[in-house]
Amino acid sequence: MRALGIDPGTATMGWGVVERDGGVLRLVDVGALTTPAGMPQPERLLQLYNGLRAIIERLQPDTAAVEELFFGKNVNTALTVGQARGVALLALAQAGIPVYEYKPTAVKQAVAGYGGADKRQMQEMVRLTLGLATVPRPDDAADALAIAICHAYTAPTLQRFGVS
């Protein structure tokens, strides 16, 4: 199984692809799509969409996982992240890729074994899980890999119970 994880954002959208062969996970590729500050929002969303479509075409994931929207105190941030999520969901749906969504606490629980893990703990667990020499950068890319790892661990159980 080849899983694409996406950490949505309009300034930076992290993405990471892992492959699971039996019980072994390996990194396929990781990165981040960025848009310039000051770029009009519709153009930012189009740039993210086109970038994500190119990644999907190049890496051919079987499945995808996107972090669910977390409503913090900043409503404007939540709205723009929601728009970026919509772009990601659209690109994945158009490519016919099944999409799963995970709450941040579920990702932390799956990757670090603790739903309250902090960012540094998560990044270190991503590094260790994939046998990497360093933590992927930027942070959004490491977050996207955590989402992909969460899905790679969770997908067999979902399939066993017929959840799609």
Curated annotation (Swiss-Prot):
It catalyses: Endonucleolytic cleavage at a junction such as a reciprocal single-stranded crossover between two homologous DNA duplexes (Holliday junction). GO terms for biological process: DNA recombination; DNA repair. Mg(2+) 2 binds at E67. One of its GO terms (cellular component) is cytoplasm. Its cofactor is Mg(2+). Mg(2+) 1 binds at D7, D140. GO terms for molecular function: crossover junction DNA endonuclease activity; DNA binding; magnesium ion binding. This is Crossover junction endodeoxyribonuclease RuvC.
